[in-house]
Swiss-Prot record:
Belongs to the MAGUK family. This is Disks large homolog 4. It is linked to Intellectual developmental disorder, autosomal dominant 62: An autosomal dominant form of intellectual disability, a disorder characterized by significantly below average general intellectual functioning associated with impairments in adaptive behavior and manifested during the developmental period. MRD62 is characterized by mild to moderately impaired intellectual development. Palmitoylated. Palmitoylation is required for targeting to postsynaptic density, plasma membrane and synapses. Palmitoylation by ZDHHC2 occurs when the synaptic activity decreases and induces DLG4 synaptic clustering. Palmitoylation by ZDHHC15 regulates trafficking to the postsynaptic density and function in synaptogenesis. Palmitoylation may play a role in glutamate receptor GRIA1 synapse clustering. Depalmitoylated by ABHD17A and ABHD17B and to a lesser extent by ABHD17C, ABHD12, ABHD13, LYPLA1 and LYPLA2. Residues 15-35 are annotated as: Disordered. The modification Phosphothreonine is found at T420. The PDZ domain 3 mediates interaction with ADR1B. Transmembrane segments: none annotated. The lineage of its organism: Eukaryota, Metazoa, Chordata, Craniata, Vertebrata. GO terms for molecular function: acetylcholine receptor binding; beta-1 adrenergic receptor binding; D1 dopamine receptor binding; ionotropic glutamate receptor binding; kinase binding; neuroligin family protein binding; P2Y1 nucleotide receptor binding; PDZ domain binding. Brain. Residues 65-151, 160-246, 313-393 form the PDZ domain. Residues 534-709 form the Guanylate kinase-like domain. Pfam families: Guanylate_kin, MAGUK_N_PEST, PDZ, PDZ_assoc, SH3_1.
Length: 724
């Protein structure tokens, strides 16, 4: 086992006597010096060199005092910004970036995304570091007074629209209302969909994003969602809508509504139209409120109560990977079900299909009683644009899960009965590997017509490895082996071609390329095991901090952080076991580090800080994924401790991609981040469970959640002792 060394990256890995540690979560931040006390009265905030009117307006800004009572899950919002990491341009302000549904802020209803926090109780947080702002919020007690500043709502153009109901009703969908906010902090009723051919579509004036103020004489400001639906339904043929049009300023990137599908629980619109809108015998599904440009949340992270059970119509455009899902079923009329969604594939990107969906029809072909072969043919011959009628039936699908489990048990028992050394006794047949690179057969000049393309992290069952150039293999997913069978390049072929490429690249260089062959990655042998804990999560690469924070704040029941250890003395307000595990002596902690009881440790101000294996295990055994901000070295240490993490590498495609994902960093910062990521990939690729890329943080975050969903278990693939 390699020894632990002191490293210099952020959070609880410190460089001695340099910068203070930014610790692993808001619950474990060191006390920092705050600005001088600020005298606050009911009319104004008074601070040196700064004066503003509370609950009034000044210029283009307005100010509000909001009092929140801390709930079981905290205050219920996320922040970004600070002097050390500005959120918008060079502005050091502390901004609200997310309102957590059901939390204290959401229940109060006044705090909004993009609000800037000026004071927390009497603590000035206008020009402080991010960690100081978090500390101020943490130490604010159970009753927290926030003084916030926000842009004045842009002037809205109000107009009256007269609609005459047609065969498709009024022809639009709505979202919002008290207790069901479409935009956090805003109880308004918004138009979220215009149905083609409906009255609103033909009239042309009502648009997505419009706010409905009144229907005939019934006001819709600050009403329940159900009341708005009732008001629209209880109208005669002629309907007068009072509508507020958003200004262009509101549509700008900096102050647009947040990505509600990644930050908030999905709510469902109510379509103001007849159920025959889709032109099918199946009833119309309710439509998600989220704009199509936003990525959907992985289904189990939302909760099944948010998933409609009615049949719904989905249109998918076939991509280079096909439709991007696998099916099971088709025996004795049991139905065809989706068993796997390929991350990044067409089905995944559409966000409208999920594991457990029964496919009722494809392009009008009824599959309710189809065999597996008939369904596969229907999907294969469906063309580029495929219309699917699907219905979510998790209970029926669970029968397949049980069947798969029984088959797996039979195979395991059979394997135990015949011996377990199959790979050693016959290394050229019947073993499982994980791909450590992407393979596109069309880019291999010597590829076979029956070759099988695959992605990094795919598990493959090698059926026949007798040929030195090509192995016959079948793709494997967590729940079953697929019908995807073909030839993959052998380990020897991959390494020889990569060696040739590197040799040509380094031709003529002084360093040469001696020894490179050993570093070429192809495949690693894996074995399947069952786990009874929530796998720890290690995210690496650019935007990892934001992804970690969002997972913790958005899904506090599914993700958690562990309590670190330290040798420094306990402060008055700290509690042992909550803020830190306070170690009695440096010698004891050093011995534990040498005994490999820590996955990572470092020193700051002559005190040791570290994350122990036991702390991670405690979170994992509580059923929560432990979010770890550690280096890639920790992956192997966790594996050695039989706590197999999900390690996700966020790979930037280019320097421009880094700048696009994080618009508030400079080009120099982006270049350093890109270089660090490149080096990280070169050194630790084999440690990654998955590699994700994206053009925006929202796309990356969605893929991260999908990876966690797919790799959570209980059956997982882990490195095997046998080597190829």
């Amino acid at each position: 086992m390699d020894c632990l060394c002191i490293v210099t990256t952020k959070k609880y890995r410190y460089q001695d006597e340099d910068t203070p540690p930014l610790e692993h979560s808001p619950a474990h931040l060191p006390n920092q010096a705050n600005s001088p006390p600020v005298i606050v009265n009911t009319d104004t905030l008074e601070a040196p060199g700064y004066e503003l009117q509370v609950n009034g307006t000044e210029g283009e800004m307005e100010y509000e005092e909001i009092t929140l009572e801390r709930g079981n899950s905290g205050l219920g919002f996320s922040i970004a910004g600070g002097t050390d990491n500005p959120h918008i341009g060079d502005d050091p302000s502390i901004f609200i970036t997310k309102i957590i549904p059901g939390g204290a802020a959401a229940q109060d209803g006044r705090l909004r995304v993009n609000d800037s926090i000026l004071f927390v109780n009497e603590v000035d947080v206008r020009e402080v570091t991010h960690s100081a702002a978090v500390e101020a919020l943490k130490e604010a007690g159970s009753i927290v007074r926030l003084y916030v500043m926000r842009r004045k709502p842009p002037a809205e153009k109000v107009m009256e629209i007269k609609l005459i109901k047609g065969p498709k009703g009024l022809g639009f969908s709505i979202a919002g209302g008290v207790g069901n906010q479409h935009i956090p902090g805003d109880n308004s009723i918004y138009v979220t969909k215009i149905i083609e051919g409906g009255a609103a579509h033909k009239d042309g004036r009502l648009q997505i994003g419009d706010k409905i103020l009144a229907v005939n004489s019934v006001g819709l400001e600050d009403v329940m969602h159900e009341d708005a639906v009732a008001a629209l339904k209880n109208t005669y043929d002629v309907v007068y809508l009072k509508v507020a049009k958003p200004s262009n300023a509101y549509l700008s990137d900096s102050y647009a509504p947040p990505d509600i599908t990644t930050s908030y629980s999905q709510h469902l619109d109510n379509e103001i139209s007849h159920s025959s809108y889709l032109g099918t015998d199946y009833p119309t599904a309710m439509t998600p409120t989220s704009p199509r440009r936003y990525s959907p949340v992985a289904k189990d992270l939302l909760g099944e109560e948010d998933i409609p059970r009615e049949p719904r119509r989905i249109v998918i455009h076939r991509g280079s990977t096909g439709l991007g899902f696998n099916i099971v079923g088709g025996e004795d009329g049991e139905g065809i079900f989706i068993s796997f969604i390929l991350a990044g594939g067409p089905a995944d990107l559409s966000g409208e299909l999920r594991k457990g969906d029964q496919i009722l029809s494809v392009n009008g072909v009824d599959l309710r009683n189809a065999s597996h072969e008939q369904a596969a043919i229907a999907l294969k011959n469906a063309g580029q644009t495929v219309t699917i009628i699907a219905q979510y039936k998790p209970e029926e699908y669970s029968r397949f899960e049980a069947k798969i489990h029984d088959l797996r048990e039979q195979l395991m028992n059979s394997s135990l009965g015949s011996g377990t050394a199959s790979l050693r006794s016959n290394p050229k047949r019947g073993f499982y590997i994980r791909a450590l690179f992407d393979y596109d057969k069309t880019k291999d000049c010597g590829f076979l017509s029956q070759a099988l393309s695959f992605r990094f992290g795919d598990v493959l069952h090698v059926i026949d490895a007798s040929d030195e150039e090509w192995w016959q293999a079948r793709r494997v997913h967590s729940d079953s082996e697929t019908d995807d069978i073909g030839f993959i390049p052998s380990k020897r072929r991959v390494e020889r071609r990569e060696w040739s490429r590197l040799k040509a690249k380094d031709w003529g260089s002084s360093s040469g390329s001696q020894g490179r062959e050993d570093s070429v990655l192809s495949y690693e042998t894996v074995t399947q095991m069952e786990v009874h804990y929530a796998r720890p999560i290690i995210i690496l690469g650019p935007t990892k901090d934001r992804a970690n924070d969002d997972l913790l704040s958005e899904f506090p029941d599914k993700f958690g952080s562990c309590v670190p250890h330290t040798t420094r003395p306990k402060r008055e307000y700290e509690i042992d076991g909550r803020d830190y595990h306070f170690v009695s002596s440096r010698e004891k902690m050093e011995k534990d580090i040498q005994a490999h009881k820590f996955i990572e440790a470092g020193q700051y101000n002559s005190h040791l800080y570290g994350t122990s294996v036991q702390s991670v295990r405690e979170v994992a055994e509580q059923g929560k994924h432990c979010i770890l901000d550690v280096s890639a070295n920790a992956v192997r240490r966790l594996q050695a401790a039989h706590l197999h993490p999900i390690a996700i590498f966020i790979r930037p495609r280019s320097l421009e991609n880094v700048l696009e994902i994080n618009k508030r960093i400079t080009e120099e910062q982006a270049r350093k981040a890109f270089d660090r990521a490149t080096k990280l990939e070169q050194e630790f690729t084999e440690c990654f469970s998955a590699i994700v890329e994206g053009d925006s943080f929202e796309e990356i975050y969605h893929k991260v959640k999908r990876v966690i969903e797919d790799l959570s278990g209980p059956y997982i693939w882990v490195p095997a002792r046998e080597r190829l």
